[in-house]
């Protein structure tokens, strides 16, 4: 379960091409992120739910004007998220949320139960299909094209009855999906008049429940900004 305390954190200003780098590889654990990137948001949420706000420093980047030193000295892939820890850099959001859960102290975000772990692994693998389908739908008929993957999530939420989340209690699976649900719920409703929760009561309840979590709520984007970002990048 997520920590019960509320840690209020000010968001640092994003670093851009004019910004000096931090003191790299000085023993500080840093999460290089972007406030608009759903993949990076996964790791940010995990950090918060583990209660690691004071142990992992946020280093947000301006992806539209990113500093050259990031690619040259930190992460040659030049993407976010990336974690600077113990003198090395680790990337890829799904790998990172597992790494944070397995490496750092704090509440476990993946169950011990074999059946739940097996289903959780299946759902984590499905994120690629889900994300690709949702983005591709923006060029066609989202109401029709997103239905199969949204129905998949709706049905998955019936699997366990010991809580409102995919594996009953909140886990890495919920964290992997919520940044994308957050964005597409807003974009499809605002631009296509498509309600992704219509006739999907479990998905609706899941969204309502996870929005109560402070560790997630502090990472959310402004809905107006979501729409503007999608208009600019994908439409």
Curated annotation (Swiss-Prot):
Compartment(s): Cytoplasm, Cytosol
Catalytic reactions of this protein: RX + glutathione = an S-substituted glutathione + a halide anion + H(+)
Top enzyme class: transferase
CDD domains linked: GST_C_Lambda
SUPFAM superfamilies per the UniProt record, alphabetical: GST C-terminal domain-like, Thioredoxin-like
GO BP terms, alphabetized: protein glutathionylation; response to toxic substance
Residues binding glutathione, per UniProt: 37-38, 65-66, 79-80, 92-93
PROSITE patterns in the cross-refs: GST_CTER, GST_NTER
Cellular component, GO, one term: cytosol
Top-level taxon in the UniProt lineage: Eukaryota
GO molecular function: glutathione transferase activity
Principal localisation: cytoplasm
Keyword Manganese applies: no
EC number: 2.5.1.18
Occurrences of domain GST N-terminal (ranges): 27-108
Pfam families: GST_C_2, GST_N_3
Cited function: Catalyzes the glutathione-dependent reduction of S-glutathionylquercetin to quercetin.
Family: Belongs to the GST superfamily. Lambda family.
Protein name as annotated: Glutathione S-transferase L3
Gene: GSTL3
């Amino acid at each position: 379960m997520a920590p019960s305390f509320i840690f209020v954190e000010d968001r640092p200003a994003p670093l851009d091409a004019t910004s000096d780098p931090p003191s790299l590889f000085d023993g500080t654990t840093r999460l290089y992120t972007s406030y608009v990137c759903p993949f990076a948001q996964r790791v940010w949420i995990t950090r918060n739910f583990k209660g690691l706000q004071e142990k992992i420093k946020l280093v947000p980047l301006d992806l539209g004007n990113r500093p050259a030193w990031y690619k040259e000295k930190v992460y040659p892939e030049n993407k976010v998220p990336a974690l600077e820890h113990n003198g090395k850099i680790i990337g890829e959001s799904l790998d990172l949320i597992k790494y944070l859960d397995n490496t750092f102290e704090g509440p476990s975000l993946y169950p011990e139960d074999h059946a739940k772990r097996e289903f959780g692994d299946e759902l984590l693998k499905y994120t690629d299909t889900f994300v690709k389908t949702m983005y591709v739908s923006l060029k066609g008929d989202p109401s029709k094209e997103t239905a199969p993957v949204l129905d998949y999530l709706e049905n998955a939420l019936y699997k366990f009855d010991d809580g409102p989340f995919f594996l009953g209690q909140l886990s890495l699976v919920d964290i992997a999906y919520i940044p994308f649900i957050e964005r597409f719920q807003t974009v499809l409703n605002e631009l296509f008049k498509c309600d992704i929760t219509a006739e999907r009561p479990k998905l609706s309840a899941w969204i309502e429940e996870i929005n109560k979590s402070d560790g997630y709520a502090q990472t959310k984007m402004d809905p107006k900004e979501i729409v503007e970002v999608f208009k600019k990048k994908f439409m």
